[in-house]
Amino acid sequence: MELQEVLHMNGGEGDASYAKNSSFNQLVLAKVKPVLEQCVGELLRANLPNINKCIKVADLGCASGPNTLLTVRDIVQSIDKVRQEMKNELERPTIQVFLTDLFQNDFNSVFMLLPSFYRKLEKENGRKIGSCLIAAMPGSFHGRLFPEESMHFLHSSYSLQFLSQVPSGLVTELGITANKRSIYSSKASPPPVQKAYLDQFTKDFTTFLRIRSEELLSRGRMLLTCICKGDEFDGPNTMDLLEMAINDLVVEGHLEEEKLDSFNVPIYAASVEELKCIVEEEGSFEILYLETFKLRYDAGFSIDDDCQVRSHSPEYSDEHARAAHVASLLRSVYEPILANHFGEAIIPDIFHRFATNAAKVIRLGKGFYNNLIISLAKKPEKSDI
């Protein structure tokens, strides 16, 4: 089965769906919103072609569930807020939003939410139905999605860490697995494995920047949020805990060691310096803003479906309940690729052990995601200067 067929979130509205387990990502979007408003302000002041009539934006790696339209809402509100601050008396521009993700993404669940979303947008923002048009653009952002110089603003949150493929070179010429008993490029991975993952990320992100520069208008903007490398004080990350859970099943005899050794997740958390270096070497974009921030990976446990903080009852401070919440989030993201390789029957056991390991980390006050926000502007052509 092709990687793109299994590298997607759990669809639907069930307990294991991404739609039901994405409160952490809501916190990330809330953290990024002030930067989004700043980025939109710079975009509108740049006076790009046709921007006062129709602003074309896209969310790259939109997934499904409530967060998808939460991102759209934040973009629309930012545009209207900045225009009001600028005292722009021209008629509001139409906003055309493209939601992009892999073909197996559950776009239908998003479409079902659109009627109520449009009504809410009209009630809260005064935007008449038809002034914000939302469409899907299925496909991989590792390839071309839009016509040349057609887009004003591109947004992506928690997607760029996913690679276009498992790096080559993880098996030696003698057929020996280089990344033995590991599922990604961890701190314990051999240097050749770490280099293979970095090389693949460099290739993918360079291609991403080049293609996006072709799709954006001159001086168009791009706002990216992704996981980046943490430090020793963060404790084991969720991929480490997932790796530990699968190793436990191997030790207990529930999985064959060869099955683990042949599994590598196409994901890479780059360092800030690695990301900056790739942007500078590719050369199409100027870095306008860069910030890192940490969030506990159980932070979303205290957030309800409307991104409001729940009451602080003893239940919500219990590390086992919080760990189970983190396990549900990870399952909603990685179940398709895990089930494809290990089989569906073992999935509950993997995440039961994951939750056990996560509870130990949470009890110690550790367990953080290190996140990066980077705002980019496409460099103007010489003829535009």
Curated annotation (Swiss-Prot):
Pathway: Alkaloid biosynthesis
Pfam families: Methyltransf_7
Residues of the site described as Involved in substrate discrimination: H155, I267, E344
UniProt EC number: 2.1.1.-
Root EC class: transferase
InterPro entries: MeTrfase_7 (IPR005299), MeTrfase_capping (IPR042086), SAM-dependent_MTases_sf (IPR029063)
Tissue: Expressed in roots, stems, young and old leaves.
Its biological purpose: May be involved in the biosynthesis of caffeine.
Name of the molecule in the record: Probable caffeine synthase 3
